[in-house]
């Protein structure tokens, strides 16, 4: 059995750890609320631009059809945008979305895909893709607590340009969708080509007046729409990250509290045994006299 001093040292160590996890839990709770606000604030923009894109995709613009709307007969070259976190200590958040990405890559290869290109958003996903030997064509890390579209556009544009130039047949995005504080789900969604289901039903049957040119308007709008989809995925992932971290740190704090209680019980038993032994020695010595 460990001595009383050793047990006290362990108790002190666990108490210090609990202080850290408790502080991280409180910080994550604060960041979670801000991340949820950013996520909700991005939704109206994405929804509005989606409706505009739906209307324009059905409008009468001569015979022009944007490459983002053209579906390929065979999908041989696939692009994957993997959204993860920069930091750990958030439970199985990254592991789950990475598993979804790997399973999807295996399915694409089984279906006849000859090339898979990856764009990684977040340090954890970037490191993971490098470890498994995936072809990473672009990445961005260290986004901080507030994602800025300017930092995302560059790496994402690599994938969009590849699709537009015919180098890719489809582009998918894998991220963690925020459901609520206690639940987050890994998602894999098709980004390109844009589908009718993704765009939704047009609001009306009337056409637009285009200035200066309809093709220019549609080109810019659809690119902005896809960028908005990626930004929304990143915002959802960040809200999920802070929620998962808060839950993980709370579990760690609760476990530390239980360990402290168990160690305190062992310490009390050890101390009681030492006192009993000392009293027995005193009584034995007195009897001998």
Swiss-Prot record:
Annotated GO biological process: proton motive force-driven plasma membrane ATP synthesis
GO molecular function: ATP binding; proton-transporting ATP synthase activity, rotational mechanism
InterPro entries referenced in this protein's UniProt entry, alphabetically: ATP_synth_F1_ATPase_gsu, ATP_synth_F1_gsu, ATP_synth_F1_gsu_CS
Pfam families given in the database record: ATP-synt
Subcellular location, record wording: Cell inner membrane
Gene Ontology terms: cellular component: plasma membrane; proton-transporting ATP synthase complex
Membrane topology: Peripheral membrane protein
Role played: Produces ATP from ADP in the presence of a proton gradient across the membrane. The gamma chain is believed to be important in regulating ATPase activity and the flow of protons through the CF(0) complex.
Subunit structure: F-type ATPases have 2 components, CF(1) - the catalytic core - and CF(0) - the membrane proton channel. CF(1) has five subunits: alpha(3), beta(3), gamma(1), delta(1), epsilon(1). CF(0) has three main subunits: a, b and c.
Family listed: Belongs to the ATPase gamma chain family.
Full protein name: ATP synthase gamma chain
Gene responsible for this protein: atpG
């Amino acid at each position: 059995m460990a001595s009383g001093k050793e047990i006290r040292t362990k108790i002190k160590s666990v108490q210090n750890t609990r202080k850290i996890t408790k502080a991280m839990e409180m910080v994550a709770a604060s960041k979670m609320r801000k991340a949820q606000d950013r996520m909700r604030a991005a939704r109206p923009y994405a929804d509005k631009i989606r409706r505009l894109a739906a209307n324009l995709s059905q409008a009468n613009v001569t015979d022009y059809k944007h490459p983002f709307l053209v579906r390929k007969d065979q999908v041989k070259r696939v692009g994957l945008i993997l959204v993860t976190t920069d930091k750990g200590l958030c439970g199985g958040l990254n592991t789950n979305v990475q598993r979804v990405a790997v399973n999807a890559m295996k399915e694409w290869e089984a279906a006849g895909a000859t090339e898979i290109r990856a764009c990684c958003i977040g340090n954890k996903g970037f490191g993971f893709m490098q470890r498994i030997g995936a072809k990473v064509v672009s990445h961005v890390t260290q986004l901080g607590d507030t994602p800025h579209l300017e930092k995302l556009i560059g790496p994402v544009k690599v994938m969009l340009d590849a699709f537009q130039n015919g180098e890719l047949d489809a582009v998918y995005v894998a991220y963690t969708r925020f459901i609520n504080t206690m639940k987050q789900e890994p998602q894999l969604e098709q980004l390109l080509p844009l589908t009718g289901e993704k765009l939704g039903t047009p609001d009306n049957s009337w056409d637009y007046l285009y200035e200066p040119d309809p093709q220019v308007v549609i080109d810019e709008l659809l690119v902005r729409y896809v960028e908005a989809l990626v930004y929304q995925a990143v915002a959802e992932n960040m809200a999920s990250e802070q929620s998962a971290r808060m839950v993980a740190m709370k579990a760690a704090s609760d476990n530390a509290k239980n360990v402290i209680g168990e160690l305190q019980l062992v310490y009390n038993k050890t101390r009681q045994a030492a006192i009993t032994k000392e009293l027995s020695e005193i009584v034995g010595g007195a009897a001998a006299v």
